[in-house]
Amino acid sequence: MFEATTILGYRGELNHKKFALIGGDGQVTLGNCVVKANATKIRSLYHNQVLSGFAGSTADAFSLFDMFERILESKKGDLFKSVVDFSKEWRKDKYLRRLEAMMIVLNFDHIFILSGMGDVLEAEDNKIAAIGSGGNYALSAARALDHFAHLEPRKLVEESLKIAGDLCIYTNTNIKILEL
């Protein structure tokens, strides 16, 4: 279900300055064929104050993006309130409960994974989250690099996604990154 991509979100503080980034690869796979190598699966929302990315069915993900963006607008960009209301709406709607997609949403203060079942998961360290077929590779690499390498945030996201792209057949190294 969640094959064909890797999305990595990373937030924190460096030199007393907050940062938030999201990155993703560009591969789209249909069965055992790569049909696109440069897709964009990340975007900024609410006047560039929130970042998001998706893994899973593209059509389902765009439905989730639209719904989340509408709720985020109604909550005036409050990410925490938006993910809670998003989860409530998702669970109420029988159609949404069948969508095969996951999202990461983050800002300078929070990072969340929105699961295909309507769950809201805050990243364990409130710093790094990853989804998709290469998500565990990217998450492991990002945690190690964050702990030991002391890289600039953009470089950490890029290198973590490259590692995932080298290991996961559904992920490539055509990486796109957005930052707040």
Swiss-Prot record:
Natural source organism: Helicobacter pylori (strain ATCC 700392 / 26695)
Molecular functions (GO terms): metal ion binding; threonine-type endopeptidase activity
Recorded catalytic activity of this chain's protein: ATP-dependent cleavage of peptide bonds with broad specificity
GO CC field: cytoplasm; HslUV protease complex; proteasome core complex
One BP term from GO: proteolysis involved in protein catabolic process
Active-site annotation: T5
Binding site for Na(+): G165, C168, T171
Keywords for the protein's UniProt record, in alphabetical order: Allosteric enzyme, Cytoplasm, Hydrolase, Metal-binding, Protease, Sodium, Threonine protease
Gene3D superfamilies named among the record's database cross-references: Glutamine Phosphoribosylpyrophosphate, subunit 1, domain 1 (3.60.20.10)
Control of this protein's activity: Allosterically activated by HslU binding.
HAMAP family hit by this protein: HslV (MF_00248)
Name of the protein described by the UniProt record: ATP-dependent protease subunit HslV
EC identifiers of the protein: 3.4.25.2
Known role: Protease subunit of a proteasome-like degradation complex believed to be a general protein degrading machinery.
Superkingdom to which the source organism belongs: Bacteria
Gene: hslV
PANTHER family noted in UniProt: ATP-DEPENDENT PROTEASE SUBUNIT HSLV, METALLOPROTEASE TLDD
EC top class, as a word: hydrolase
Subcellular location: Cytoplasm
Pfam family, one: Proteasome
Predominant place of localization: cytoplasm
Subunit (UniProt): A double ring-shaped homohexamer of HslV is capped on each side by a ring-shaped HslU homohexamer. The assembly of the HslU/HslV complex is dependent on binding of ATP.
Family: Belongs to the peptidase T1B family. HslV subfamily.
Matches recorded under InterPro entries: ATP-dep_Prtase_HsIV_su (IPR022281), Ntn_hydrolases_N (IPR029055), Proteasome_sua/b (IPR001353), Proteasome_suB-type (IPR023333)
